[in-house]
Curated annotation (Swiss-Prot):
Keyword Cell division: yes
Subcellular location: Cell septum
Protein name (Swiss-Prot/TrEMBL): Sporulation-specific cell division protein SsgB
GO BP annotations, alphabetical order: division septum assembly; sporulation resulting in formation of a cellular spore
Organism: Saccharopolyspora erythraea (strain ATCC 11635 / DSM 40517 / JCM 4748 / NBRC 13426 / NCIMB 8594 / NRRL 2338)
Cleaved signal peptide residues: none
Pfam families: SsgA (PF04686)
Amino acid sequence: MRNDHVTLRSTAVFDLLAPQTPAVPVQVELRYDTRDPYAVVAAFRTGRAGWVEWVFARDLLADGLIAHAGVGDVTIRPAVDDPEVVVIELSSPSGHAVFEASAQELADFLDRTYDVVVPGNENLWVNVDDALTRLLPHDLS
């Protein structure tokens, strides 16, 4: 396990798509934290003080840059008509949203994460003892 924790942040603007209305720009903060080396966080600005966070696999983001990836709550794929755009769909019991994002911005963010944790070396950053402590009940009596 590595102890030299790193958090990467990148801001972007995704376009929220809705039928028969113009796209709405949404501020997004992308985060990568070596304490959870398999995941990325996309935090979407929902208003003056609100953010909604989605956590998904770093591999899902990488795979979605080149082909349709994901099943269920998060799917990512290149746009059919524009190779410079990636479509991100998010689904939850409270709603469904479709965003378009710059493929280059997402690729640049991923490259920065790979500079910190090389794909395939994520396990070197996982603190198994800490993870078990959080999962197991503290009172085992």
